[in-house]
Each structure stands twice: as C-alpha cells, then as structure tokens.
Amino acid sequence: MNYLFKNGRYMNEEGKIVATDLLVQDGKIAKVAENITADNAEVIDVNGKLIAPGLVDVHVHLREPGGEHKETIETGTLAAAKGGFTTICAMPNTRPVPDCREHMEDLQNRIKEKAHVNVLPYGAITVRQAGSEMTDFETLKELGAFAFTDDGVGVQDASMMLAAMKRAAKLNMAVVAHCEENTLINKGCVHEGKFSEKHGLNGIPSVCESVHIARDILLAEAADCHYHVCHVSTKGSVRVIRDAKRAGIKVTAEVTPHHLVLCEDDIPSADPNFKMNPPLRGKEDHEALIEGLLDGTIDMIATDHAPHTAEEKAQGIERAPFGITGFETAFPLLYTNLVKKGIITLEQLIQFLTEKPADTFGLEAGRLKEGRTADITIIDLEQEEEIDPTTFLSKGKNTPFAGWKCQGWPVMTIVGGKIAWQKESALV
C-alpha cells in the first residue's frame, strides 16, 4: 500500500517546523514537499499534525526469552509502536543471554517472527553477563549485534572492560555500559539522599555511578573505543562526561524521560513504581541533567523501558525489582514537561529522540529523507490525555506517571511503509 499524507508539518533539514505533504511508495519515502499529488496512493489528511521520523530508542528491555511473564517481543514492540518508536535496541539481560551463536540466532528468529517494529539486539560483553569470560564479539557482530553491553550490571573487572573495548574498537563497534561500582551500591533501593534518610532506607550514592563512568572513560581513551553511557543520573557523571568530550574522548551518553521529569523530591511515598535504577536523584542532579542535555554533554534520550508484573512491584520498595515502563508515555511526558514549559524546543526534542541516537550509532534512521525506509510517526501535539496504565499495550503497567495529564500523543506509526499501529478514529 502507498500512502500520501496531506497537510502535515515536519522538521526540515534546517531544523525548522514547516508545512508539508509526504508520499510513501513501496515502503520508501518517495517525496517530502508541499502540494504533492499521486495516483495509486491512499490519501490520509493529517490536518496539521506533526509528521516525525520514527522515534529511535537505544535502551529497552523486551524480556523475551525467559521473562515472558513481564513482556514479550510482540507486546513490547506493539507498545513501542504505540509510543511512536520504530527502531528499538534490546538489552541482553534475557535468559538465556545472547552471548553465543545459538542464543543470538534464537533471539533473531524470535524478532523476525514477532516484532512489530525494527529491533536491534545487543550482544553481551561477557558470558551470562557474569563478568569473567568475554563473548565472541566477531560472531555476535556477524549475527547482527547492535553493540556490546552487560547492561544491568557494570563490568567490574577493569582488565576485562579494557580488553572488551579493544576488541570492540577493532570491529568498529560501541561498548555500552550500565555504570555502578558494586562496592558502593550499599544494598540500596533508592538514591542516598533526603528520601532514603526520611524513610530509613539504604541508599545508592551518586558516586557509585560517576566513579564507574570515570574509570570507563579512561579505559575507552586507552582503547580508542566508542563508549556509550546508559541512563546518566548524577551531576558528577555529567561533569566527567563533559570533561571527556572536551578532551576528545569518544564518549556518548543518554538520559531517560523519568530522570528529566522527576527527582527524589517528587517521590510521594515508598511506592515501588518510583523505584528504578539508577534511582531518582537530588534536585541538583536533575538540573545538571537538563543542562547536560542542552549543552551537548548528553546526546540523546532513551526510555530504559523496563516492564514488571504488578505482583513483583507489590513486594514493597525494598524487595520490588527496579524499573518502569517507558514506551507509551515518553513523547507526551517530554513534550508536556520540557517543550511546553520552554525548557527545550520541539525541534530539539525530535532530534534527541530520532537523529541523534541514529547518528551516534550509524543507523539509517531518524530523518525524513527521500529514498529512505518509511519509518514515520504522526503526532497530535494538541491532543491531551491522562496517562492510564490500564490502556498500555505493554504487559508492564508499572509507571509513576499514572493520572498525569499530557499533550502530544502519537496517533499513527508506520514501519517500513506499513501501518504498525494507529489510534482509532484519530485520522478519520
């Protein structure tokens, strides 16, 4: 099916939002211009809505295989499509871990069979993410590994991390890291700060993250490796990443929507839906993340979509697993709380969710360019809705944002020229 989207708006190559039509033919973007006419195409009048590149998320957890009670590739990618994401990068903390030919081939077969959006799987740095034996990077790359990470646990052995970075650099691949120094975690369930003190909870100190990042940056410099930092959360982390970039070290970084919108002051009670890793930090950390995003220290926004069951989250804040769902709330949360409040522009938000992650990892995505695959998201910037977890397509309903009123909701997502999801009656 070919589609002609009429009367939309998009961000052009100069970074300005302008009026446009967009023609999709044979799965490709055929033309982006005003006043397009075409035969043999279904005309869809988007009536002033935003025509955006499909959103790109480099940090997601789909749980399959091994965690299908939390999420599956099918439910997770449907949720991604509903959130406007057309390309997502799946972390390797599954069971089994994609750490060898057999496991990666199985994962890729599952993705091919079940995914509703483009899914790029990470390969593990170490076997079973145990930190002691390096995986076969060459084989994992051959089988389509997006990059290498032991996400969920930082690689604690510096010699192992250096060896991994050297091998990744030879393959022109990135090493991606969840950064925690295990000896400083303190069995914490929240940030070490006012909230932990008030509620008598063990806290995770900010330096637990920043000291690990500082170590890895120096290792990346020694290995001449592209090093990407997951979900930055502290003022100290922003500082060391900024210093590294100024020194010319190949480091990039991401931040989550929840760390941009919330800090520990916003946690109303010991509610496990506010438990994520890294935890919500202090107000100064929150302000540093915004500053880092604006000055280019932080390159992109990634959801860290981490679904869990209601039963798991009901165990209380100390025992419940870390993580919240992110796909279906990311864009409206960011548009409402950052763009509408004048903290960033709409153009910047689009870049942080599309071209910046794509460019950082060399993906042919993130831009509406003629000849490229038609991965497109239509967004109604005027639509206001209340976040209702019962309507999520994800199996995970675990969100701290239930009841929040937000504007800017995706209404249609096109992947490879085909409609992957659309809101009922949104474009009628």
Curated annotation (Swiss-Prot):
Cofactor(s) required, per the database record: Zn(2+)
Catalysed reaction equations from the record: (S)-dihydroorotate + H2O = N-carbamoyl-L-aspartate + H(+)
Sequence positions that bind Zn(2+) 2: 151, 178, 231
EC number: 3.5.2.3
InterPro entries given in the database record: Amidohydro-rel, DHOase, DHOase/Allantoinase_Hydrolase, Dihydroorotase_CS, Metal-dep_hydrolase_composite, Metal_Hydrolase
Keywords assigned: Hydrolase, Metal-binding, Pyrimidine biosynthesis, Zinc
Membrane-spanning residues: none
Gene Ontology CC terms: cytoplasm
Coiled-coil residue spans: none
Physiological role: Catalyzes the reversible cyclization of carbamoyl aspartate to dihydroorotate.
Protein family membership: Belongs to the metallo-dependent hydrolases superfamily. DHOase family. Class I DHOase subfamily.
Official protein name in the record: Dihydroorotase
Organism listed in the record: Bacillus anthracis
Name of the encoding gene: pyrC
